[in-house]
Amino acid sequence: MSDTEELYSRQIAAYGTNSMNKISKLKILIYGIRGLGIEISKNIILAGPQKVTIFDNNKITIEDLGSNFFLEEKDIGSRRDKTSIKKLLELNNYVKCDYLKDDNLEMHLKEYDLLIISEIMDIDRIMKLNKACHLNKKGFIYCLVFGLSFYCFVDFGKHIINNINNNEQRRYYIKNIKKGKKTMIFIDNEFENFELNEGEYVILKDIKGMSQLLDGKKRRIINCKKDKFEIEEDSTNYEDFIQGGIVEEVIENIIIEYKELEEMINLPEKCEYINPTNKELNLHLAFLSLHKFYKENKKLPDSTNNDLNKILNITKYIYKKNKKGWCKNINLDEEYIKDIYKYSKCEISPICGYGGGVVSQEIIKYIGLQ
């Protein structure tokens, strides 16, 4: 066993050699190295990609020491990424780690497979970066921690899911085939129950006789019983069935295309996969309000009454504007939203740890799409 195989032995056992090879070729750019960004960086460097680049040219403050576990008091005033990279380099000698000198993310995108933004920025720029990633088939993740709240938006473009339920392909032995306007296939279920359902597809193999059924085409099951089913195929003039054969389940691939943030900004109205609760709708409203406040003030709100009143007015404006759209199902919970705003500047370490785990798992999912 080589050194790298020994280092990643548990991952290889969990994901398989093919997935580990994909991870080892991945190049990731991470914007924002506070609590959430450092958790993501740490997790993914330990997973063994080819390259991880970070960017955060903000100066380290005393507040950063509460969430970025690589920083010390003596680092206050230094640049976040330049200081953090020293410790990140120690995590895994097989991963190239560096930091960008400038924040021209648009120019650097072509060098990476995946862009992760873990720091709030102008929502218009976020949407432009997302669009650039979408058009160029790059992965995109935008994730934020506001106090006790964690947000994550993922866009991995168009992809195919193979075997969505990870089921083992089912096969059954053929006992007999009856010719007719509809072809009836009898299953030998002496040792195994027949568990396929009407509407599913099968391929027929290794039949002696009836060579017309051995064309490799998938056929739809109809009139399914416990030991037989039919296919809509006129076999009246086919060769006679002699013996044997296998019915093999066809596991259909599912095509999914992630939507861009610009379209999904009205998520509760357009998302096909969830039925959001009132609390989740209020969270989304808070997410939009925080971005509008940030765009207008170049900062997140303080816990002062002045800032809280400003952002609550923004929230009411967005709510009223979309009352006939996605906000029609929201019972506005001002106290709940106000608590989010009070602590929006804070990145609480346990929440960052949780969020970092979620994002890291999304990155592992991404390699399955390549």
Residues of each region from the PLM?
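Adenine nucleotide-associated cytosolic modules
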Residues: 1-370
